[in-house]
């Protein structure tokens, strides 16, 4: 057989020469390569021993595959190559063929030599009944070790091919299977190191280079690779830091080993070691490491110790140079210090089961090495660290050792032992273990059994130390129970609670304490955002869960705010809020740009608002509700009380302010929130009467406002309306702070935040909403902009039955225009329960302060537009509207005469209702939204509550695609309020899987904390169509919303009301924003819409002014008829472009 193999080898040499001949074309070279592959395969299968002696497996890889791969890779990387795309295609095809070749070769080798690999799929599983081997008599049976080697060779190169194809997970799997097959061969470990290096994992890279060297058959290139990696680490600059993160510690740790391995700058070892010991203790108590990292650190130390003095040197007398002795001393000191801290950590944290800080595997590995090197106990550095042994004894006694543990003969390897099989420094310790079963050695409760086996082996090592080093440890046997004792006094560490700061990830541990100390109202708000339930208990969770937000908050920490406010903000930070919501916090009119990137939960996100006279200098404190301030001085009819949110004066700063904050346009709301834009705050918000319920609702509004703002609002509520209970704030969008909190809590709600239309919303929120509505039903379009009775009617038509409104028994005074925030209707189907719980309190408390008012829009409001001064708004109508708004359900269970008048004609008419037409004319609504809303008594509420209005619900159900787009920028700001409205239910009904919770935080472009659940609305983007930055429902990206005024054509359109909560399909398909810029989609149609709106407003004026005190079906019917006619005329123009 050797003759035939020799003949194959000669033919292979000829083929290799032909392949290097430049005269041959690609086709001839390809043919020669295929022939060479076939020859080598035959040699490996027929005479494996001969082939391995001739290194055929290496020639096969190098000449048949690697050289060609390297050539194609070089050509593909050359950007000047005009045929790059063709080369890349050829490379992909060649890698695919190479993978197939080695897979087939491995399968054939296993079949021919009857090798059973754990990673191999047997032929029977592939449907192959029999494997008839041809020429079986000609096959020379190889040794089992040769079979294992060639199979490992195939697995390694399969991993290489997968790595070239950027399939890192598959490559790692191949490498690990290869290492398990022959642990004494260093090649798989070298490849794993290369793979880890490509991922930027420096600690794992060094670990596997050490593993590749410290084996029976080290891989030659591993030593060179390790030297290069350590040299590169030494060349990096040192950064002076008082506190290190894990990455800082790893860099310093690798530098330390670079000094030792390369014997360079040894004078730096001692100070660097001391710093490493100090930071290791701090990080370990903070649970910054995981179990695998601790094992890697320990093994790297053991590798260096073994490299300096192996076992052969232990038994013989050797003279060491001064440098070698210094390196050994410093390394051993570092190793023993780490061991002591590892023994102390589980006692301090009492969390052995925690994967984040589980040091026992590293302790086990360290103790195994000490048992193999008994002379180490005589070293001076070990004597200097006798405090280790009392800690070790406490650890062993915590296992409740028994005499039976010493006789345990379980040979099953632990995970750390399985990982380190073949490691020369520990090889003798693993001789009695059975690695043949791989990871399947333990069945049933693996973790529990492994924990007990590890404890038993540690107890056994402790007993060995007690027998051989009685001066350090003694062991007493009391009726089968073991007790370890020592005469060495135990060292009490400095308060390790410092470690519990949760360093790195939790640098702002204060945030957690603040959240814990925060008022129950704030907690409830946070919990609401987090969980559908309104329970305050859930509020605590957000504090712990949203640690990611802490970092962004650090950025804002620079701003000085009252501690009280900071607390609230801290909690808010924990509950990720859409950047848009946070944006409103900033005072600058350009907030839109900043707000996207400033989460509300950040302290700096809420600078003090100088425009608020009554507001305390601390920006975090939210002033009590301000008396109604109507720019026009308009007053509502007697008997009608309008929340301050609705009464915000049109005098509010122009849209610019609103835009900057992206906050709701309602001044009262911004005033409540320190983060509201200064100009907006200056508006009548301040003058809102303390009776406004928004304050009470603020706690429930966690969506929009920061926790601090919520707290401030609660205080203000108590001041303004001490008699009012602080209900769930979630429903009252007017309260920006409340909304922010809710948004933070609810990830899906946060999606709304990104639009951060709060400021624009306050201005022309309703109209803009319609601008952004998709080609959805005119009613739906209208609903976002006009959430007043019109909106109610539309949703009522669709959902009125399912949503019985609260009995129309609210007093006019209690009924606030903001209450018309159709929170209940907005969440009509899924949010009913939540809304039922929250709507009354939230609406009342939030609406007055935070309602978005079209008045705030730069467009001046007509005197009649002012909700207070508008004579067009009949008291009865106001009362009825307020009652409807107050009622959580959209259904009018006990509507006054006005309700039937409104519902009957509006809901039943086949054509568009007045409100529908208004909605269809977003531009008009935008310009006259304040007037219309004030006329209807919904102006403020609609603006503030567009998200929660029943039209939103309708959008949520029917207009999922355009729901987000439909929402106005103001709606986006109101999103927070919507969330607060639905504290119990985070719009789960309309949100499929696109809620913030389902969305990865990282997708949230505006969220400073990508991990935070309630992070900015961008989180929803994953659900929405990729073309838009909208939330799952299609809400435009917060960034777009914030930078541009939604009401302006140049601003991004946003669906902040119910649309954001719609299913992802709505955002992807229906969202007209997708087709065009989200902000300016409707702006192009603004003039026509404004004209129609003006005409409609004039007609309303004439009708309502004539019968102001006698609202009845006749006036409404006339208005509806006019509206219907107008709709028919300009219906085309009213529909938003898609």
From Swiss-Prot:
Residues 548-582, 854-868, 1037-1051 have a biased composition (Basic and acidic residues). One of its GO terms (molecular function) is protein phosphatase 2A binding. Residues 674-721, 1000-1026, 1118-1132 have a biased composition (Low complexity). Residues 515-612, 649-745, 838-871, 990-1090, 1106-1138 are annotated as: Disordered. It is found in: Cytoplasm; Nucleus. It holds the Pfam family EST1. Transmembrane segments: none annotated. Coiled coil: none annotated. Its main location: cytoplasm. The modification N-acetylserine is found at residue 2. GO terms for biological process: nuclear-transcribed mRNA catabolic process, nonsense-mediated decay. The modification Phosphoserine is found at residues 519, 732, 848. Plays a role in nonsense-mediated mRNA decay. Recruits UPF1 to cytoplasmic mRNA decay bodies. Together with SMG5 is thought to provide a link to the mRNA degradation machinery involving exonucleolytic pathways, and to serve as an adapter for UPF1 to protein phosphatase 2A (PP2A), thereby triggering UPF1 dephosphorylation. This is Nonsense-mediated mRNA decay factor SMG7. It comes from Mus musculus.
